[in-house]
Amino acid sequence: MGKVYVFDHPLIQHKLTYIRDKNTGTKEFRELVDEVATLMAFEITRDLPLEEVEIETPVSKARAKVIAGKKLGVIPILRAGIGMVDGILKLIPAAKVGHIGLYRDPQTLKPVEYYVKLPSDVEERDFIIVDPMLATGGSAVAAIDALKKRGAKSIKFMCLIAAPEGVKAVETAHPDVDIYIAALDERLNDHGYIVPGLGDAGDRLFGTK
């Protein structure tokens, strides 16, 4: 059964405050998202398995621990998810990066895939899907669907800010997926924005609308 993890680390919460602030400019916003993604990656990789190897220090031989050959994949949901990728790769530079692009069908209002590019060894990798916002949950559910449809068996979802509605949607559709968030906000407004939220993450990351 999937779990929901809310990271209340002081550094994450401090930086998240400035990410939320409407007066934070594009450059600083981008840097802060990158930094928070790195801090969250530190926590999300806490359960990686370790194995012992023998090394030689300048003083003697020793047994030491290394990550046990886990293959990781980072999957940003386009476009805003791109802003979190480099922060994660700072800690796990060997991870492969895929991309999932979705748009909302104007008739059904449901997410539709327009681009999916994944590592060739999908079934062998542990995936982290990243998107700054988990609002209605539609994009997150669709992205997880896309990965599972192509053979992925181990998936985590990571975002900066989530609404209860989005968390519930992911839990209902994919109860096996753990959700990692920096803040769980109050609700969605009538326009589908998270309250208090941070606005449109993609617009603020890239300076475009």
From Swiss-Prot:
Enzyme Commission number: 2.4.2.9
Tree of life domain: Bacteria
The keyword Glycosyltransferase appears for this protein: yes
Entry binding sites for uracil: 194, 199-201
Disulfide bonds: none
Any one GO biological process: UMP salvage
Full protein name: Uracil phosphoribosyltransferase
Organism of this sequence: Geobacillus kaustophilus (strain HTA426)
Lineage: Bacteria, Bacillati, Bacillota, Bacilli, Bacillales
